[in-house]
Amino acid sequence: MTIPLTPPSERARTNIRTEKMKRIMAVWFAVWIVMSANAQDALKKVYNEEINPIEQIDKALVEAKAGGKHVVCQVGGNWCIWCLRFADFITKDEAISKMVNDNFVFIHVNYNPRKSAGEEKTRQAAAMLKRLGNPARFGFPVLVILNADGKVLHIQDSSFLEEGQSYSAKKVLRFFKNWTPAALKS
């Protein structure tokens, strides 16, 4: 038999303090979850989950050919915070936005591998990945540069463009500059 070293009244106070700490921790955890969810919701959803990705790419290629541009496929989804951050980043930086608009047809190609999306969407996702050279191996978002004929010129792992919790303007601008039609002709 062990004899408690603290009197019963002290044990009761300790239990009360422990319960208060548990409640405080639970509240902080709930606040953190809500803030995390709101941070993702604050970014604009840029992926159209309803369209066929192959048809989306074909349409972009027609536009690119007419404009003498390349196509950039940002493959990912609204489920991917880094995909939404990249989309937000390139539209807010004037130099990057101009570089993209002048040289590329930029599309957000939705990727949803889940069977819950339906058999047709799963088939479309697999066909899109095959057509783009299996870019999913690099994670998301992944950037695929196509020439106006649909040939894959480059697949970019976007993690190399990151800086902190965002992206490096210098790296992103250099990436786009190196894959413009003019850069490949020189």
Regions found by a protein language model. Give the residues of each.
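A short beta-strand-turn-helix
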Residues: 53-71
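Short active-site neighborhood of thiol/selenol oxidoreductases, capturing the structured segment around
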Residues: 67-81
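Sec-dependent N-terminal signal peptides
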Residues: 24-33
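Thiol-based oxidoreductase modules, predominantly thioredoxin-like and allied folds used
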Residues: 97-123
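Boundary at the C-terminal end of the N-terminal hydrophobic targeting segment
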Residues: 37-41
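Non-catalytic, surface beta->alpha helical segment in thiol-disulfide oxidoreductase systems
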Residues: 138-184
